[in-house]
Amino acid sequence: MKKMAVQVTGLSFSYPDETKALGNISFSLEEGESLGIIGPNGAGKSTLLLHLNGVLKKDGGVRIFDEVIGKQNIKKIREKVGMVFQDPNDQLFMPTVFDDVAFGPLNLAMEKEKIKEKVTSTLAQLGLSGYEAKNPSHLSLGERKKVSLATVLVLEPQIIVLDEPTANLDPGSKKSFIRTLKKINKTKITASHDMDSIYDLCSKVILMNKGRIVARGSAENILRDKELLEANNLEVPSRLRS
C-alpha cells in the first residue's frame, strides 16, 4: 500500500496586508504521484507551494508523510521536500556549479569525499558532467534550471516541488528539461501556466482561482475541458486541440 506523501486540509492564508491568498485548500497526494497545480496569475499557486516545505507556515494545515509541519520539525520537513524556484537566480549564488550543488550537503556536515561523490553523480544524472568548474551565471537559462534542480536532488528529497519549471525556456530547452523531469522517480508537484508541460508531467491536476480550488481530477479530463480552462484564462494543451 502506498504512503500518503502530502495531505493539505482546510489551508487558508492571508498576507500581513490582509490580502487573502488561500481559502480552505484541501487535497492529498500518494507517494510517487505527480500533481499539477494550474490557474491564472494571482490564483495562489506559488503561495500554496511555499507552505509545502514550511517557507510559509500555517499550523496544522499541511502534513508530509503524516507529519504536521511545525517549527519543531522544519529542518526534517525540508530534507523531505525539495523546492525548485522559477528563477534559478533565487537558488544559485556560488562561484561554481560544484559549489552551488555542494552547498546543501556541506551544511549537513557530510564528509568531503561523500559530497564530491554525490555532486558528481547528481550532475551526471542531469547530463551536466564536466560542469563542475563552470560559473552558473555564464550558463544558458536551461542549464541554470538544471543546476537549480541538482541543488535539490543532491539532498535526496522524497518530494520535488517545482514552480513554473519551463518559464522563459526556448522550445528545445523546454523539451530537454521536461525529459529530465520525467526521469525523476519521485513524488512531484508542479505549478505552471504551461499546459503542455503539465500534460507531459502530471497525472492529476488541481485548478485554482482566487485562492480556491475550482476543479480537480485527472490531467486528461481537466486539460481537455476547453470551457473550464478558458473560464480561468488558460488554454487546452496544443496536443489536445481538435
Set out the residue ranges of the language-model regions.
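The feature captures the beta-strand-to-loop junction immediately N-terminal to the Walker
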Residues: 38-40
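Helix-to-loop junction immediately C-terminal to a conserved catalytic motif
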Residues: 53
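Conserved ABC ATPase "signature" region
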Residues: 113-131
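Conserved ABC ATPase signature
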Residues: 135-139, 143
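H-loop/switch region of ABC-family ATPase nucleotide-binding domains
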Residues: 192-193
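A short, surface-exposed alpha-helical micro-motif characterized by mixed small hydrophobic
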Residues: 198-200
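Conserved beta-strand-loop-alpha-helix hinge in the C-terminal portion
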Residues: 212-235
